[in-house]
């Protein structure tokens, strides 16, 4: 074979290798930048801020931080003797006005039966007015009694649902004000994912699509279903002036960063058992209408999914 032929073969091989490399790099880049995935995803759950409806000293806190509690379980108790005394006083007032109202009712009935032949109309009207006044006062004391009873019931704060007590920052002996958050309750079986996907990747995301979730630092792959896509995000380029007119930012960057849009993903029920704290990070890949068969993925695809963990 001549030297010229060898040169042609070498050049051809080199060109072929370069072309294949360019194609591979292009495919990798397109796969990496256009496929619907993100490393910016967070585990989230329904969280209830537990705050008392009454004020007073904490007498009991029978739970511990990060404890799993059942629905209706006592979380803490507030100064019941004070509210028991208030209820007893209110019940005494109700009993007094019930007796007084019965007495005034008998007096009015007696005067009404006697009629204007024995009494003046003014005396009959006066008895009626006194009866109405006492009845109104009785209704008021009953309302106060019912409120005192409700306050006493609410001195015992119970878990509204099954979940984990977290950030418990109160202890027995402390004074707590009405409406002051004492603890957070993370509801069990309510965990979901908020994946912040770039707007350029939303074309491949639809409600009902399946998703793979890989917690940061874990090899376990969880599965879920896209529930919804956020209907809007903050417009940082525009604001309203005092007249209500839009104020537009005059600066337009040469490099425009894609806006991130929250996508809510519900975890499958079998994956709810793996407890990853709300707020921790995960990588999310939207696989389309169906789950991806891990055995059919090419080595390059597997490599790309692994590289996503590193950015």
From Swiss-Prot:
Organism superkingdom: Bacteria
Transmembrane annotation, as ranges: 11-31
Cellular component terms (Gene Ontology): plasma membrane
Topology term for the membrane: Single-pass membrane protein
Pfam families linked to this entry: CusB_dom_1, HlyD_D23
Main location: membrane
InterPro entries: CusB-like_dom_1 (IPR043602), CusB_D23 (IPR032317), MFP_Efflux_Pump (IPR050393), PHBA_efflux_pump_AaeA (IPR022871), RND_pump_MFP (IPR006143)
UniProtKB keywords: Cell inner membrane, Cell membrane, Membrane, Transmembrane, Transmembrane helix, Transport
Record flagged with keyword Oxidoreductase: no
Similarity comment text for this entry: Belongs to the membrane fusion protein (MFP) (TC 8.A.1) family.
Protein name: p-hydroxybenzoic acid efflux pump subunit AaeA
Organism phylogeny: Bacteria, Pseudomonadati, Pseudomonadota, Gammaproteobacteria, Enterobacterales
Gene expressing this chain: aaeA
């Amino acid at each position: 074979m001549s030297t010229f032929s060898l040169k042609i073969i070498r050049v051809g091989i080199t060109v072929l290798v370069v072309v294949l490399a360019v194609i591979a790099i292009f495919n990798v880049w397109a796969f990496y930048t256009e496929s619907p995935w993100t490393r910016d995803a967070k585990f989230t759950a329904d969280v209830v801020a537990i705050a008392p409806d009454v004020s007073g000293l904490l007498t009991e806190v029978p739970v511990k931080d990060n404890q799993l509690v059942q629905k209706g379980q006592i979380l803490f108790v507030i100064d019941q003797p004070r509210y028991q005394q208030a209820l007893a006083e209110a019940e005494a007032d109700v009993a007094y006005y019930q007796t007084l109202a019965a007495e005034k009712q008998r007096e009015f009935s007696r005067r009404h039966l006697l009629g204007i032949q024995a009494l003046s109309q003014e005396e009959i009207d006066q008895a009626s007015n006194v009866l109405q006044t006492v009845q109104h006062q009785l209704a008021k004391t009953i309302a106060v009694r019912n409120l005192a009873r409700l306050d006493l019931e609410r001195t015992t704060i119970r878990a509204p649902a099954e979940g984990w007590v977290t950030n418990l920052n109160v202890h027995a002996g402390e004074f707590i004000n009405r409406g002051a958050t004492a603890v957070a309750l993370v509801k069990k079986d309510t965990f979901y994912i908020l994946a912040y996907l770039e707007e350029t990747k939303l074309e491949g995301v639809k409600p009902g699509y399946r998703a793979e979730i890989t917690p940061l630092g874990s090899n376990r792959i969880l599965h879920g279903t896209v529930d919804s896509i956020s209907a809007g995000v903050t417009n940082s380029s525009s604001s309203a002036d005092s007249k209500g007119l839009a104020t537009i930012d005059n600066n337009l960057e040469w490099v425009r960063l894609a806006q991130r849009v929250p996508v809510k993903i519900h975890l499958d029920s079998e994956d709810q058992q793996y407890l990853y704290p709300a707020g921790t990070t995960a990588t999310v890949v939207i696989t389309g209408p169906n789950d991806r068969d891990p055995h059919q993925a090419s080595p390059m695809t597997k490599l790309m999914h692994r590289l996503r963990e590193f950015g």
